[in-house]
Amino acid sequence: VTLMNGAFDGSGVLGGYAYVDLIPFVDIEFDFNIQGNTYDIEFQNAFGDMPKINFAWVSGNTYTTVRKKIVGLSIPFLAGAQLHGGLGINTHSTMPVADVKTVERLLGGDLLNADPSSLDKALLDYLEDKENRDDASGFHIQTGLQFKLLMIDTFLIYRHTFADDVIPGASSFGTLNMRLGLGI
């Protein structure tokens, strides 16, 4: 029995963020990311081969954070820098990925001897069904550096996310983000 998924290396990512710093004492930040890639799914067993499927994998997440400046310095109207920390909530939604358990279930529990000739249709139906998406939510903590020069805003943020089922076998994960934007 052979099940092969193409690698997810080189996935494309699109994201955005907005934050409001008009509230005294804290800032509120919202950001989102959408990532995706295409990959080939191939399956073989003693009975035969499944026709190869080219499938698009997509995942999205949102983060809402309340953050507070820890320390900062500025040259009024020209430049500034600050270190901030924050806490927030997040949501994640990912299309399922073809794995051995899924294929085994679609073949009626017999990976070795089941006829895979119609597995491609059943697998596509399963992967495209919104009910099978992997949805998760959790909370996160983050710390970051912000640099401003006139209207140009740059952030370097480390965020640690606590959410089950986003990464198989892990209940948390860290990310490092670099952002560039314009302050309005």
Short names for language-model regions:
Residues 1-6, 35-59, 93-135, 166-170, ...:
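Flexible, solvent-exposed loop segments that connect beta-strands
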Residues 13-17, 61-67, 140-142, 177-179:
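Membrane-embedded beta-strand positions in outer-membrane beta-barrel channels/transporters
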Residues 154-164:
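Transmembrane beta-strand segments that form the barrel wall of outer-membrane beta-barrel proteins
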